[in-house]
Regions:
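N-terminal, charge-rich interaction modules
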Residues: 2-121
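Cytosol-/stroma-facing membrane-proximal "stalk/adaptor" domains immediately downstream
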Residues: 111, 120, 124-216
Length: 216
C-alpha cells in the first residue's frame, strides 16, 4: 500500500515538474503571444502559484518578476476577448491620488473631482473618451459593490490598474465572475503618490479598440 502511495507521489511530482517546465517555456518564448498557449501557461502558473513564489523568492528575493509574467500571460490570453466586451470599466488604486486629496469616498470608491493634483483627472478624461467609467478603489471589497451598482450594470470588461501583484490577483479573482480583464501596471509599486504612464495607458486603449475594429 505504502509503495503504491509512494509511486503515485513520484508520478505526481514528475507530472507537476513537466507542467511547470511547459508553462515556463511558454512564458519565456514567443508562444506567450498565442492566446491559447498563454491561457494554458497562465492556468498552470496559477495552480502552482505558491511553490513558484517560493522559487522566485529564493532566487530573486523579489516576486515582482513572477507577478509581471503572470499578469502578462493573462493579458495575452484575454486581450482578444476583452476587445469584444461591450460595457467596460477602469479600476484604479487609491495610492495614485494626491496626499492632499479631499475627494469623498462612497461604496463605489473615491469620487474624483478632477482637481488636477494627481493623474486621476487626465485618467478619468481618457477613460471616458474611450467609453470606460473610472472607479477609484481603496480595496478589493469595493469591487463587488461597484459591479452591483446601476452605473456598472452589465459590466463584462474590467481594465485594472495597479502593481503587478494586485493586477494578477484581481484578474484571477474576476475570472470566476466570467468577466474579461486586462491589466495596465503602475510605473512603480507603493502605498501613496504612485503614477501611471498616461501615454502608454491611452495606447493600450487604442490598441484594444483596434482589435475589435471599432471604438467601444
Amino acid at each position: 500500500m505504502y509503495d503504491e502511495i509512494g509511486r503515485l507521489l513520484v508520478i505526481g511530482l514528475v507530472l507537476s515538474a513537466i507542467l511547470l517546465f511547459i508553462a515556463f517555456y511558454i512564458g519565456h518564448t514567443r508562444l506567450q503571444k498565442n492566446a491559447a498557449f498563454a491561457s494554458y501557461a497562465s492556468r498552470v502558473m496559477d495552480f502552482f502559484y505558491k511553490p513558484l513564489l517560493a522559487v522566485y523568492m529564493f532566487f530573486y528575493k523579489n516576486p515582482d518578476k513572477l507577478h509581471k509574467k503572470m499578469a502578462d500571460l493573462k493579458n495575452n490570453a484575454q486581450r482578444k476577448k476583452f476587445s469584444k466586451t461591450k460595457t467596460r470599466i477602469v479600476l484604479a488604486p487609491h495610492c495614485m491620488r494626491h496626499v492632499e486629496c479631499k475627494a469623498r469616498t462612497t461604496r463605489t470608491g473615491i469620487q474624483c473631482t478632477s482637481c488636477g493634483k494627481c493623474d486621476f483627472a487626465e485618467l478619468k478624461k481618457m477613460s471616458e473618451e474611450h467609453g470606460y467609467k473610472l472607479y477609484i478603489i481603496t480595496g478589493s471589497s469595493f469591487v463587488k459593490h461597484i459591479l452591483k451598482h446601476p452605473d456598472a450594470k452589465g459590466t463584462d470588461g474590467v481594465l485594472a490598474i495597479g502593481c503587478n501583484y494586485e493586477i494578477n490577483k484581481g484578474m484571477r479573482e474576476l475570472k470566476r465572475s466570467k468577466i474579461m480583464t486586462y491589466g495596465v501596471p503602475l510605473l512603480s509599486a507603493g502605498c501613496y503618490n504612485t503614477h501611471i504612464d498616461l501615454e502608454e495607458f491611452e495606447r493600450q486603449l487604442i490598441h484594444l479598440e483596434g482589435l475589435n475594429g471599432s471604438k467601444s
